[in-house]
Amino acid sequence: MIRQRTLKEIVKTTGVGLHSGRKVTLTLRPAAANTGIVYRRTDVNPPVDFPADPASVRDTMLCTALVNDEGVRISTVEHLNAALAGMGIDNIIVEVDAPEIPIMDGSASPFVYLLQQAGVETLNAAKRFIRIKKPIRFEDGDKWAEFVPFNGFRMDFEIEFNHPAIESDEQHLLFDFSSQGFVKEISRARTFGFMRDIEYLQSQNLCLGGSFDCAIVLDEYRILNEEGLRFENEFVTHKVLDAIGDLYMCGHAIIGEFRAYKSGHGLNNQLLRAVLADAEAWEWATFEEEVGSPVAFAEPGMVLA
């Protein structure tokens, strides 16, 4: 059968918080079958746990943030969550000693490397997929996102940025998910922002960790990073990365096609909530044979980078 996965060993790294600009220590710990994905703040006493759940997402203004009833939060979880989805990790404890996950280079690639460093352990329990059974759509003005039944996990995403540096023919991406495809084609895409917005946020004491090291930065006319883009469609690819992370907030791989136009963290989360709230829209699926799986995860020992 296709089994649940966790890490072989504990791994740790440090980085900078995007909003605070301060050093953050991130620790990833193995967890038993059916634990799920749990984010944990260790700098509060007692530590506070946030199980991966779309209902825990209560702020999507600048990132995806998990917030509990007491107002304790962990921000910027989406890139790490995308790496967990990409590597097929079902059970893990993610510990941070700050209110946010470190931003690293603004992509999911450092987290993929960290997970590969820890190694992947298969557990003696069936991996549970969420299979989409009927179309569900969520709209917000001209923006929309929808799930339709599909025997695999496909992302069909379109953005619309009227900017000289963002080519009009590089604003659409169709991606059929596999671990290998995620690592090679998606994980290295960085977040992006406009210099005017970053300057304004920093004047409000936000985005203090924002820099050319962790984002693609644009002015009105061009990309300001000396090294330019990692690949031509990096902008839409990063939006797909974000969506993979946002949708994995249900803690399970999805079998279905996600289509979106100008969607962001908020819309992705609202769609996920709408799907899970409709008992006729989805069902649990497990697979006795690896060969029969519509979603391809890499073998645990395989190096993908």
Curated annotation (Swiss-Prot):
Pfam families: LpxC. Catalyzes the hydrolysis of UDP-3-O-myristoyl-N-acetylglucosamine to form UDP-3-O-myristoylglucosamine and acetate, the committed step in lipid A biosynthesis. Pathway: Glycolipid biosynthesis; lipid IV(A) biosynthesis; lipid IV(A) from (3R)-3-hydroxytetradecanoyl-[acyl-carrier-protein] and UDP-N-acetyl-alpha-D-glucosamine: step 2/6. One of its GO terms (molecular function) is metal ion binding. Zn(2+) binds at H79, H238, D242. It catalyses: a UDP-3-O-[(3R)-3-hydroxyacyl]-N-acetyl-alpha-D-glucosamine + H2O = a UDP-3-O-[(3R)-3-hydroxyacyl]-alpha-D-glucosamine + acetate. Belongs to the LpxC family. Its cofactor is Zn(2+). The keyword Lipoprotein does not apply. Gene3D superfamilies: lpxc deacetylase, domain 1, lpxc deacetylase, domain 2. This is UDP-3-O-acyl-N-acetylglucosamine deacetylase. The active site is at H265. Coiled coil: none annotated. One of its GO terms (cellular component) is membrane. It comes from the Bacteria. Its EC number is 3.5.1.108. One of its GO terms (biological process) is lipid A biosynthetic process. SUPFAM superfamilies: Ribosomal protein S5 domain 2-like (SSF54211). It comes from Vibrio atlanticus (strain LGP32) (Vibrio splendidus (strain Mel32)).
